[in-house]
Amino acid sequence: PEHKVRFSFDWNKPEAHYCSQCKHYWTGNKRYDWAWVNVAHTHNYTYLRNCMYLYLATGNKVYAEYIRNMLLDYASKYITYLDHDTARKVGPWGGKMFGQSLDESAWASDVCRAYMVAKSIMTTNEIREIEKGYLIPCSKLLLRRRGTANWQVWHNSGLIALGVALENDSIINVAINDPECGYHAQMERYVMDDGWWGEGSPTYHYYPLRAMLLSADAVRCRNINLYDRKLYKMLAAPASGVYADLYFPAHNDGWYGESFIAQVSLYEIAYQRYNKDPFFLSVLQQCYRYTDRNFGEALQNNIEIPQVTAMAAWPSVHFKETGYAVLRSGTK
């Protein structure tokens, strides 16, 4: 707090938080202790996601067992967690693991994918325990959280993931088709015709876009196709409006320094789902001039991306609804 650096996380010290600058453990502050819980759940999320990709890549059953064991542990505890918001009170936007239903939804969106990947090695009783202890209680919580904009987009993503995991089409239907809060309602209300999210900033555009991609991918197994023209435009618009160095301008309430390269994993999915779209191929090639292709989403793609060394000569573009324009000359 004095040196403006993040505390070093220690699994064994939930109530003592080490500052690398002053070499001191900070104790006696409940807000720091609550933050430790937040970080612990986030580390577990990363662990489950990594195990999912490792199991898919290697077929080694041990990674599926890691997923099963952690989810069984969560299932034994989740219902004991109190509903709370960021002030540790019961509120309309609180969660159980996190102080925001937004974070609860994001966690569920990916963790349910890990569950589905590992489900085949689980017994009937283990599946029932995870459903009763985590999947069903979390879905009930999120069904009570009716918001707008990026919050609701993530609520829907979490609900879709939970609905698919539970094979419950009624949950999926609410998340997609609810006239006020569903996926289609949010897409209609907040995505402009030129593809930009209503806030008009890459910083805020990609946050709901990832939830929408997760939603679209999740329901493919239920024979629902959300990969329509509007989602395509949501992916293409910011990519079309990037600087030659693959950084975004600082428009609306965003800020300069936002890198397009940080979003390349989303275009691995887009390239595959939109039938090897040539623009998305060019996007991937340009990004991989600057970074390694080591994203988990590349495993889902399983397609060779030819390397290029030259900068792309993308055309000038005018986003009529948003009011942005990019003038280009060759690669500049």
Predicted regions and their residues:
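A mid-sequence, solvent-exposed acidic-amphipathic segment
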Residues: 144, 148, 171-175, 185-197
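Carbohydrate-active enzyme catalytic cores, enriched for enzymes
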Residues: 160, 166, 204-332
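Acidic, serine/threonine- and proline-rich low-complexity regulatory regions
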Residues: 190-201, 219-224
